[in-house]
Design a protein with these regions (language model features):
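Extracytoplasmic/periplasmic ligand-capture domains
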Residues: 1-42, 48, 58-172
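Extracytoplasmic/secretory soluble proteins
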Residues: 51-53
Length: 172
C-alpha cells in the first residue's frame, strides 16, 4: 500500500498521508456498508454477501473468514476519530460502469453510505476500456474489482489482488 494516495483530501486539502494504510480507516469503511441494503436495493436479491474475496465455491474458502463484521455506522465514526479523521476525509472511488452487474450503482450506493460517517466520495464511473488502464497505472486511490477463480483455487485471487507489489521482483 502506497504512503501517498493520489485522490485523497482532508479538510479540503490534498494530503500526503494515505488514510487507507490505517486498518481502523479500512474497518470503518467496511462497517459503514449496509450489505443488506446493497443486496436488496441495488442487487435486487440476486447476490450472496461474503466477508472475503474468496467465493464459497472455491477451494480454500473458509466459513469463519467469510463472516462479516456488523453494519455499525457509530462504530465506524468512532474508528475514524481514533485514526485521526473525526471529520472524515474525501476520496475518489474509481469504478467501471460497464463491466460488473450494477457496478456504477454499487459505487454510488457506497458513496451514500460512507457519507453518513463523514467520508465524502466522488464516484468516477468510467468505461472499462479506460478504467483498467487507469488502475494498472496506479492512478487511483480506491477502485472496484471483481474476481473469479478460474482455477477454483483461492491462491489465484489472493495472489492477484492481495500480494504486495514488488515490481523489481516481478510480482504484485
Amino acid at each position: 500500500m502506497r504512503d501517498e494516495s493520489p485522490y485523497v483530501f482532508v479538510d479540503g486539502k490534498k494530503t500526503d498521508k494515505n488514510p487507507f494504510k490505517d486498518i481502523r480507516v479500512r474497518q470503518a469503511l467496511y462497517q459503514a456498508i449496509d450489505i443488506k441494503t446493497l443486496q436488496r436495493a441495488v442487487m435486487r436479491g440476486f447476490s450472496i454477501p461474503n466477508g472475503t474475496i474468496v467465493s464459497s465455491e472455491t477451494n480454500g474458502w473458509s466459513a469463519k473468514a467469510a463472516d462479516r463484521l456488523p453494519y455499525d455506522p457509530q462504530a465506524a465514526k468512532k474508528l475514524l476519530a481514533e485514526a485521526g479523521y473525526p471529520n472524515g476525509f474525501e476520496f475518489t472511488l474509481d469504478c467501471p460502469n460497464n463491466r460488473y452487474i450494477n457496478d456504477e450503482a454499487i459505487g454510488k450506493a457506497l458513496a451514500g453510505m460512507w457519507a453518513k460517517i463523514g467520508v465524502k466520495v466522488k464516484v468516477n464511473a468510467i468505461p472499462r476500456a479506460n478504467y483498467f488502464p487507469k488502475v494498472l497505472r496506479y492512478d487511483s486511490s480506491v477502485g472496484m474489482v471483481g474476481w473469479g477463480a478460474s482455477t477454483q483455487d483461492a491462491l489465484f485471487p489472493l495472489q492477484s489482488l492481495v500480494e504486495t507489489v514488488a515490481l523489481k521482483k516481478g510480482n504484485g
